[in-house]
Amino acid sequence: MNYDFLIVGQGITGSIVALQLKKNSKKFKLIEGGSPNTSSKVAAGIVHPISLKRCNLSWRGREFYEFSDSFYKEINFESDTELYKPYKLIRIFASFEEQNNWIGKTNNEIYKHILSLNSKKIDSLKNRFGSGIVEICSRLSVNEFLDFVSSSFLKSKVLIKDVFKAHELKLKNNRFHYKGDIYSNIIMCDGVNALKNPMFNYLPIIPNKGELLKVFSTFLPTKIINCGIF
C-alpha cells in the first residue's frame, strides 16, 4: 500500500502531526511502540506565551498560543471532553528584582493583557516578594489527549502498535519501504529513541532523568503555581 507519510512516535508531537495530516486529507500511518516512560506521558501540558525566567514574551509566543488554543479547543469538540481548559498561572517572585521587572512589564502595551500583579495572599506559601499572574494560560490533560488520539486512529486502522525497527526501513526509488508498505515521507517523532536510530544517532541528544511526586489533596489550589518548578 502507498502512503504519503509514516509517522514514528505517538507522543504529543506525533499526535498533533497526525491530526494535521488527517485534516489536510493526507494518507498516512502512525506507529507507536507503547513505552510507559516517555517525556509526553509526564509532560505538565501547560501552554502560555511567556518565558518565565526572564519574564519575556517568547518568540512569536502570542501567535503560537492562539494557534494552540484554537487547535486544542477543536480537540475538546471532537472528543466531547474537556481535555484542554484555561487556568491562571501564579508566578511566585524569587526577588525584588523579579518583582520590579514584572511590574514594569505590566505597564508595557505588549504585556498589559498578558501579565498582571496578584494582590491576593496565597495561603500556606512563603511569598515574601509577592507574585504575578499570567492571564493567558491553559492546560492540556496530556495522557487523556494521547489516549483519545490513540483510540481514534486505532478505530480507523491508521495506528500501528509496534516498535519501529530502523533496520527494516529501505530506500528505493526515492520512496521509503517499511514492512510491505511504501511511503513518500517519514516524520520521526520518537524523542530520545533517535539515539537508537542509525539515521539520527549522531545528534547530541542527552537523555534527561527526572522524578515525579503525585499529591492527592482536597486542599490543592485550582490555579497553576510556579516558582522555578510547577
Residue spans for each PLM region:
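Extreme N-terminal leader/targeting segments of oxidoreductases
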Residues: 1-4, 23, 143
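Beta1/beta-strand and adjacent pyrophosphate-binding region of the FAD-binding site
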Residues: 1-13
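Hydrophobic anchor at the start of a short beta-strand
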Residues: 5, 27-29, 131, 186
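Conserved Rossmann-like nucleotide-cofactor binding loop
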Residues: 13, 36, 193
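Flavin-dependent oxidoreductases
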Residues: 16, 172, 176-230
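Glycine-rich FAD pyrophosphate-binding loop
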Residues: 22-41
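Dinucleotide-binding Rossmann-like beta1-alpha1 core, especially the glycine-rich loop
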Residues: 45-128
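Helical element adjacent to the flavin cofactor pocket in flavoenzyme catalytic cores
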Residues: 132-185, 189-194
